């Protein structure tokens, strides 16, 4: 059986991973049992990458592995712009296998699946919907969930394509020509 724990931790700034480090140092959280981190950071879109970097650096030190290994092992969903609506914080999910209790009551379960990196033109299309649906089915199986009615939360966040980093996609000529014929673009 899976034992899942959730830790909601305050975050003073996008680089503040001190509370998680404290939980690890105290033995409350085993870094090798961390299976996901969701953070709501302050700041703009750049703060999300900065926060992920800070988690990767601290966890790579605690787990004695490279940043890349941490990133491949622990999905990190970073959301920016708290904008005064909520306090910056992060949620750490841990899981480990334990012996099943005698009763069979339903309890918190967690399945994680990451799709392949989508091409820029695939976002918002049936391709993305199909990939997410397949990933949800696989995550349900991993979590031991057989009835979709027992699924209460699915987090979806597009992963940036590293091949596109710092590049804007080339404009599609067919769309530009169509827009030009409609009189939307001027020569």
Model regions: which residues?
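Terminal domain-initiation and capping elements
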Residues: 1-187
